[in-house]
Amino acid sequence: MIETTVAVGSIVSRIIQLHYFFSCTFQLLTNTHSLSTRYLTHPKGDFLVDSDTQAINESERVAVYTVQQPAFKRAVKTVYNSIHHKYLAKYIDFLRRGEKFILLSYPISRGGNWLYLWARAATLRHHGTDKASLLYGPGMEVWTEEFPKLASITAPLSEYTFFTRRSGYFPTDIEKDISEEDLHFFIREYLLSSEAFSERLARMQNVVDENSLVINVRRGDYYSVPQINEVFGIDTVTYVEEALKKLQDTVTPSKIIFVSDDLQWCKENLSHLSSVAPCIFEKQGSDMFDDLALVASAPYLILTNTTFGYWGAYIGELLAQKIVLSPDIHQVIPKDGRTYQSRPKMHRTHWIAVHHPEGKSWITGELL
């Protein structure tokens, strides 16, 4: 009986390993772009091809949004994924045991995206649910250097095998995926515990006063790449003007400090806001973590649709933050440009949503 059970288990294991091999081969054959296997990981995180652990450059990242597979191959992939989830996933999960639980991120992810996954890993560990970690990805080094405790919930590639439990779920619903208590626990224990970041906060708190306004403007590929612009590009000037009007119902800022990846654009397009308060377009500090510290230190904050800014606002909840304003949309859902969320998943419910003055979408310009 024991020998039979072992034999059956061995056969099942071999079948699933063959399925794993053919799954990876299928991914390679159905992608039309030479780089696309790096991005198109399984939506449930059931496998990760070797190239998914490699660094990608900016042009490759843009390809995620611009490369389109032929309709036939997309249909074949849809059918394959449906069969996989219905009949094979549960058997694969049966073989995956052990205390380690790996969270996967897409190679196009950056710091703001990773923080949601690190927060989930920290929460699972805090509650004793799983020994969870985020799988290492290129570029994480600067984050684990700035916030050393994040290294303790980051798994090296050597820990990721076929038999490792894993999840490809991206926990971005800040009100449902993590409680306020757990969010604040993660920020205190893993971010504010950093001596280097605490020093940055101290410096930036000397830059602001009790009525300072910080405006975080995301530019970059949101506006330089048409396909990405269609998904994320908001009418920044009109939005910032409308947000400032709404803020002035409560307070007139003593000064306005801009944080952006394109401060020159801000100076050229938003300098007229100096009629409300003195504007500072010079970079405060030397790198992105100084920017994050400044956003977190803001008593009053106007955000655009960027996860980096969202995390600055989350951190600010534990500091001297008073009011946060954000656009009423994060992105357009590609499958349905009219899909509209009453609250973008990454936005906190106490943030003030800024609506278009003409009742339009900030991104598409269409009436809602």
Give the residues covered by each predicted segment.
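Secretory-pathway luminal glycosyltransferase catalytic domains
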Residues: 95-101, 137-251, 345, 350, ...
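A short, glycine/small-residue-rich beta-strand->loop->alpha-helix junction that serves as a flexible
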Residues: 106-116
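Membrane-proximal basic amphipathic "stem/tether" segments
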Residues: 5-6, 12-26, 31, 39-103, ...
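Short amphipathic alpha-helix
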Residues: 116-124
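Donor-binding and catalytic core of enzymes assembling or modifying cell-surface/extracellular glycoconjugates
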Residues: 111, 248-334, 338-340
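A general structural motif
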Residues: 98-101, 129-131, 210-212, 251-255, ...
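A structural signal for short, well-ordered beta-strand segments and their strand-loop junctions
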Residues: 103-104, 131-137, 214-216, 257-259, ...
